[in-house]
Curated annotation (Swiss-Prot):
Its main location: cytoplasm. Signal peptide: none annotated. InterPro entries: Cdc20/Fizzy (IPR033010), WD40/YVTN_repeat-like_dom_sf (IPR015943), WD40_CDC20-Fz (IPR056150), WD40_repeat_dom_sf (IPR036322), WD40_rpt (IPR001680). The keyword Cytoplasm applies. It is found in: Cytoplasm. This is Cell division cycle protein 20 homolog B. It comes from Xenopus laevis. Belongs to the WD repeat CDC20/Fizzy family. WD repeats lie at residues 270-309, 312-349, 352-391, 396-438, 440-481, 484-517. Induction: Specifically detected during the phase of centriole amplification.
Length: 517
């Protein structure tokens, strides 16, 4: 049998040049694959296998581009500078023009002004119309993807613009906070109108709780809106000039106890920044304001000027207190800063807690500083701002130490109220660190005040009764309960003549009580 060989196709012989290029491409491919794998591991993973900070930061930035930023962290980003302004009401003279400044305009991110809202509807209509077109499925997917990206880009830039507008500086009109005296029958406040429908029930409830030995009588009722329902803030103070300062969201209101009117308002630049603490200097009209952005501002109420803006904190400043010219401020990161307001380099000392600062109080003689934190630590510090950084005493509590005050007639005695899971009043002797008296209230204690005229103790409570209670000292025998609020009584303040008490509650009400024998 003869075999016939046929040539089916010509054999291709690779030349040296082809082999060289093939080798080069293989080498480059291996190098690129190894390099990308190595770099991704290096960039995205840390030695312990967790995500790196750069990857975490990129994901946060992508979220901010799509959504309004969350206020889930007390740490301040410091991404915008504040320009504050102060305003008087009608009964006051016009503000000083020397301080009035026009804030620099904020540069907005790109905004698609040429794309109306109809553009979004057009994109949706085009997406729906693709279902009826007899085109290949792959082509439909590509077109849908392109139209979806156009719609998403438009919505993202709209969200970014809204975020920037929230931080836009300037004296914008604030509708989220207000303060006015209740006019009883003619009052037009929303909550007051609702209460009129239940008037008979309210009167009966109050009548049943009136006691013959009552020493507190309601004198003025105020409606307030914008008071943060935050247990860890200190938003009320009454000074020696009979002026009450109260923080309502991004505005500090100044209420005159003599005229019984709101005389001044101090605005923070943006609704995103709120007043977190207020404190008057011992003698004078200098007001310290702590903000949620970590700033401590000093204002002179008489001249209507901001004296200075002291930086240093990186989180919410929830507590302030004065000791002559030394201002102490506490933040939610657990730092306590001492500021000497007389000098340019104001920061003269720092103290440290493990958790956030809830309260700061200097003793009446100014020799000791008491600080309470959210983890239940109560520390007593010496009066040496630039020196010793270790506490004299540490007295642990089962809950946060927020309701705290020094006894005005016993300089070494400190009263502390327990939180939700505690409810105990504890009286401490700070000389030896002993708990000398205690009483169970069966309720959260939100505020605590000493009453010098009758040598008694007043506490403001939370759920479920939201009452104010007077206790006899030192026996801590309950004298009477007072019901003037439907929300927890977060703040209490005593007038300079010690005859009136200002109470502010979470339900948007504030009362001025007449106090005496």
């Amino acid at each position: 049998m003869d075999w016939k060989l046929e040539k089916i196709s010509s054999r291709r012989v690779r030349g040296e040049e082809d082999m060289m290029w093939e080798s080069i491409m293989k080498t480059l491919g291996r190098d690129l694959k190894w390099s990308r794998k190595y770099n991704m591991q290096k960039m995205n993973k840390t030695p312990d296998g967790r995500s790196s900070y750069s990857r975490f930061k990129r994901s946060i930035m992508k979220r901010r581009a799509c959504h309004v930023p969350f206020a889930s962290s007390p740490v301040s980003t410091k991404w915008c500078q504040n320009m504050d302004q102060m305003q008087r009401t009608g009964i006051s003279s016009s503000p000083s023009e020397e301080y009035c400044q026009i804030p620099d305009p904020l540069v907005l991110l790109p905004y698609l002004t040429e794309i109306p809202v109809v553009a979004i509807r057009d994109c949706d209509q085009k997406l729906d119309s693709l279902k009826d077109i007899s085109t290949p499925k792959r082509t439909q997917k590509v077109l849908k993807k392109l139209l979806s990206k156009t719609r998403l880009r438009f919505l993202q830039e709209q969200n970014i613009l809204q975020t920037v507008e929230e931080h836009k500086p300037g004296p914008s009109i604030r509708c989220d906070n207000n303060m006015q005296i209740c006019e009883k029958d003619t009052c037009t406040w929303k909550e007051c109108l609702q209460m009129k429908k239940k008037k008979s029930l309210v009167q009966k409830t109050q009548k049943d709780n009136i006691c013959s030995r009552a020493v507190l009588q309601p004198e003025i009722q105020l409606h307030i809106s914008g008071l943060h329902n935050d247990y860890y803030l200190n938003l009320l103070d009454w000074n020696s000039e009979n002026l009450v300062a109260i923080g309502l969201k991004s505005t500090a209101y100044i209420f005159s106890g003599d005229n019984r009117t709101v005389t001044q308002k101090i605005y923070l630049p943006s609704p995103a920044t709120y007043v977190s603490s207020v404190s008057w200097i011992s003698n004078g009209t200098c007001l310290a304001i702590g903000t949620s952005s970590g700033e401590v501002q000093l204002w002179d109420i008489e001249t209507q000027k901001r004296l200075r803006n002291m930086l240093g904190h990186m989180s919410v400043v929830g507590a302030l207190n004065w000791n002559h010219h030394i201002l102490s401020s506490g933040s939610r990161l657990g730092h306590i800063h001492h500021h000497d307001v007389r000098i340019a380099e104001h920061h003269v000392g720092t103290l440290q807690h493990k958790q956030g600062i809830c309260s700061l109080k200097w003793s009446p003689c100014g020799s000791k500083l008491a600080s309470g934190s959210s983890d239940g630590d109560l520390n007593i510090w010496p009066c040496d701002p630039a020196g010793e950084t270790k506490p004299l005493l540490n007295m642990p509590h089962p809950t946060a130490v927020k309701a705290m005050n020094w006894c005005p007639w016993l300089s070494d005695t400190l009263g502390v109220g327990g939180g939700m899971k505690d409810g105990l009043i504890r009286i401490w002797d700070t000389k030896c660190g002993k708990n000398i008296h205690s009483a169970n209230t069966n309720s959260q204690i939100c505020s605590l005040l000493w009453l010098p005229q009758t040598k008694e103790l007043l506490t403001g409570h939370g759920p479920s009764r939201n009452q104010m209670t007077i206790w006899q000292y030192p026996s801590l025998l309950k004298m009477n309960d007072y019901y003037g609020h439907k929300g927890r009584v977060l703040h209490l303040a005593l007038s300079p003549d010690q005859r009136r008490i200002f109470s502010a509650a979470a339900n948007g009400t504030a009362n001025i009580w007449k106090y005496g024998n």
